[in-house]
Amino acid sequence: MLTLKKSMLLLFFLGMVSFSLADDKREDEAEEGEDKRADEGEEKRAAEKKRFLEGLLNTVTGLLG
């Protein structure tokens, strides 16, 4: 029973954090212009892809080396 309570509390906490981040992002986007959002979105996606690929490469080389 205690494990179930801990799991439920963890899920609730993570859900609230996710909701809070999404709400903040939505408010920030509402303040910016549509063109600016599109440009920033492309830059963010490119940066995320780069970080992902670097992390993946580091993981693979760590496993091989």
Swiss-Prot record:
Region (Disordered): 24-45
Subcellular location, record wording: Secreted
Signal peptide residues on this chain, from the entry's feature table: 1-22
Listed InterPro entries: Frog_antimicrobial_propeptide
Primary localisation category: secreted
A Pfam family assignment: FSAP_sig_propep
Keyword Secreted assigned: yes
Protein name: Kassorin-M
Species this chain originates from: Phlyctimantis maculatus
